[in-house]
Each structure stands twice: as C-alpha cells, then as structure tokens.
Amino acid sequence: LRQVHLWNLGFIKDKTKGKYKEIEDKISDALAFMEACGINSDNNRRLRSVNFYTSHEALLLPFEESMTRIDSTTGEYHDTSAHFVWIGDRTRQPDGAHVEFCRGIKNPIGLKCGPTMKPEELVRLCNILNSENEAGRLTLISRFGADNVQKYLPKLMQAIKKEGLKVIWSCDPMHGNTIKAATGFKTRPFESVLKEVKNFFAVSQAEKSYAGGLHIEMTGQDVTECTGGAQKISEDDLSNRYRTHCDPR
C-alpha cells in the first residue's frame, strides 16, 4: 500500500486518473496517520501479514483424493488442496463421483448453477452437499450468460427460499459469456460480463436474497484476452497479448 502511487495505471483513461489519484492520496494519508499514532508493521503483526485463501474446481478427483487428510482430533476429512473447492456445472450429477467426494469433506464447497439446473435438482443437491443445512458450508455460483439471468435465477432462488436452505449466492459472469471471435480466439466481451453482474444483483434484490460474491477469472499479467472494457480491446487486438492456456481472463 505504501507503493500505491507506483502501481501501473496505464489501463486507466486520462479523464479517470484524477479519481484514482484521490484514492491514492487518502490511502497514503491514512497510513501516515497510523504511523504518527505509533501503529506500524514493526509492532503490529496484522500490518505485515494477511489471511490468504485459495480455491479451485474439484475436477481431477485422483488429485483431490490424494490431498485429502483425516483430522485426527475429529475424524473429519479435509481436502488440503485448497480452502474452498467447487463442483462444475458439467460434473454436478447428484449420483456422480464429484458430488460424492465433496459431500464427504469438511471444506466449504461451491456448486456451479447453469441454465440446465432445475429447481428440484438444486434442492436435492443442496440436501446432499449440506445435509445439516450449515450456514457458510455451501455457495451456489450462478453462471447463466448475461441474457439468461432473469430467465433462470429467480426460480432457483425461490426454490431455495421455500425450502429454508442456508446457502451463499455468488455470481460467475465469465463462463456463460464465452464466445469465439472471428479471429479464432476464445474471448469474453467485458460488456456481457458486466451485464451479468448487474442482472445478478437486480434479481437478488427482487427476490430479497443476499448477493454474496463474485467469481471472476483474473490475472496480474498485462493481457488482451477479453474484448471491450476501458481500453476498448477489439477482436483484432486479442493476438497482441493472448497468454492464457485455458480461459480468457
């Protein structure tokens, strides 16, 4: 944070840099005030360390199983490959191996919900994966595509609410908006990503449900993998810095 003024702002248009400069100054002022009060990283451990959590899809079951350990004090199973693992939209069969594995571990888990998810199937999966209806145990990650959110999400939220199931609702605006550009690259229009996020929040508000998070694929690299955005990246620009080996970030 002390180096915030040196962060790369090349992606920001000139007319918006003033807003970020103001935020930078406020951060620097806050740190200076804390220093003046005698609070610094030398005498406060919280200022020199962070809680860092990892997450990934529990797709390769031989790997996940090899990383699973038993807590000798409780007898519970924990998947040590990540703090939070999720089940993909294509591997969420109620009687499938991925669901069976995830229901047996104590990690918080996620479940991707796409356009083919039926309300009754979702309720069944919730009862399997979170049989004790424990708050914080199960996160439902919607991924419909920008134009399908209002068609599918309300019914799922209504079914969960009717059954009194305790879940966290999250939004994945990436996977439902993947397209193939004319140039052959797999990409995602930023405008579609943003639209799905806005529609997710709108439906959550209408259904009186709490919007609990976003699932976004990002990278610290300077890439040109999604079109649009602040730089208005075109399909022709994708080849400039297309680095991903899988999905566009």
Annotate each language-model stretch with its function:
Residues 142-220:
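Extended C-terminal subregions enriched in glycine
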